[in-house]
A protein has these predicted regions:
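An N-terminal assembly and electron-transfer interface module characteristic of large anaerobic redox
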Residues: 1-125
Length: 125
């Protein structure tokens, strides 16, 4: 009926800085996918470096995604996470996890601070 509305297949790529637990980003990514109730493609590749970034972009492209959410489940690696936007041919939105589960030992990810660095790095690209 409405042919002028784009058909969006949204993908979710989680990123993680290697000095933080990778499982923190993966757990938080899974929680987002669960809340989205199947309306989101979950990329199984967690990006910590440039090689992971290339694998993740190839994965979401192969899955037919035409828009992305790049999710900082913890601080995140500034260069690889921002290169996702360069290599993915479509819109990318960057979001960061909130600290809120009370686990300040294994659950602290400093994603807000990572988002500040990410924003600065995106501005340089």
């Amino acid at each position: 009926m409405f042919e002028n509305i784009p058909n969006v297949k949204l993908g979710l790529i989680a990123v993680s800085r290697d000095c933080f637990p990778r499982t923190l980003s993966e757990m938080r990514r899974a929680n987002i996918v669960k809340a989205a109730k199947g309306e989101l493609y979950e990329c199984p590749v967690t990006v910590e470096n440039e090689n992971d970034m290339l694998k993740a972009v190839a994965d979401v492209q192969a899955a037919g995604c035409n828009a992305l959410v790049v999710f900082l489940g913890n601080f995140g690696p500034e260069t690889p996470e921002t290169l996702i936007a360069k290599y993915f041919d479509g819109p990318c939105m960057f979001v960061a996890a909130a600290e809120g589960d009370g686990d300040l030992i294994n659950g602290r990810g400093d994603a807000y601070c990572g988002m500040l660095n990410c924003s600065y790095n995106l501005g340089m690209r």
